[in-house]
Amino acid sequence: DDFDIIILELSSFQLELIDEFRADISVLLNVFEDHNERYGSYEVYQKTKTKIFLNQRNSDYAVFDDFYLSEKILKGINPLPKHVLFKDNEFNDLGNKISQNGIIKKFLPALIKVTDILDVDRNFVINQLKKFKNLNHRIYEVCSKNGVSFINDSKATNPAAANFAASQFKDIYWILGGLSKNNDLTKLNLSNKNIKKIFLIGSSSDQLSQIIPKKVKFEVSHNLENATRSAYKEVLKNQKGCILLSPGCSSQDQFIDYQERGNKFTKIVNNLVVKC
């Protein structure tokens, strides 16, 4: 009762439990294959995500990529709230003016649509976005020194998220692997021309080693500390590069969660690089 607006980020696990929950404005962002060990197929996972629209009224709003309308994933939801569609490349020019931050540009269309519904001044939105800093474990720069950057993207627990992170950098020394969750790891873009070397960790190492293209250098590092230290040695040889922890897999084979994994990476980096 003390707030005018409450913003909730809901996982598929939480959406499974929806009974009476109703959103005035619901937003469906990117839905890529994940949690196959739980749902068995991408289609079931996708359908679970659409539960965010349940219980909405005709006067409410559903904000989603127009791709989902063509895929008919809203079929069966009745009554259907007002549609507010966006496209991935919508507001590209505005995004380039605001920031080179890939996360901002990726989600700007949905954000603009929601703030327009709420009648928030566009200039206010733009000014706030210019101040935006990535959250920890989400393409977060731990350190940058002497041409070497360390990026903590431990939250990237599926191939699509890892691919997005890797698309943001050049001269990448990529720390990859963990618990696959039965996801299709062949969807990882391991032919990315900016990859210098891949360092494999966790239980998916053997599986990943079988699908890495022959032209791409890699080593099986087994654990995060070995991978980070080995990547640092490699990047120092070239005197520039990005050591990217974006595992594309869950962390529970070696860690409690992605946060513990990301914090471990940060600690290793701080021990490696003095006065970063």
List where the protein language model places each region.
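Flexible active-site lid/hinge loop adjacent to a nucleotide/diphosphate
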Residues: D2-F86, E90-S99, S251-Q259
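Residue-level signal for inorganic ion chemistry
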Residues: E9, L29, Y45, H83, ...
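Short internal beta-strands
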Residues: A62-D66, I175-L176, N194-S203
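Short, charged/polar "capping" segments at the starts of alpha-helices
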Residues: F67-L74, K181-D184, S204-Q210
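Beta-strand->loop->alpha-helix junctions that form or flank phosphate-binding loops
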Residues: N78-F91, I126-K130, Y140, F218-E225
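Nucleotide phosphate-binding/pyrophosphate-handling subdomain across enzymes
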Residues: Q100-I195
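C-terminal helical cap/extension that packs against the catalytic core
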Residues: L185-C242
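Glycine/aspartate-rich loop-and-adjacent alpha/beta segment that forms the canonical ThDP
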Residues: G248-K275
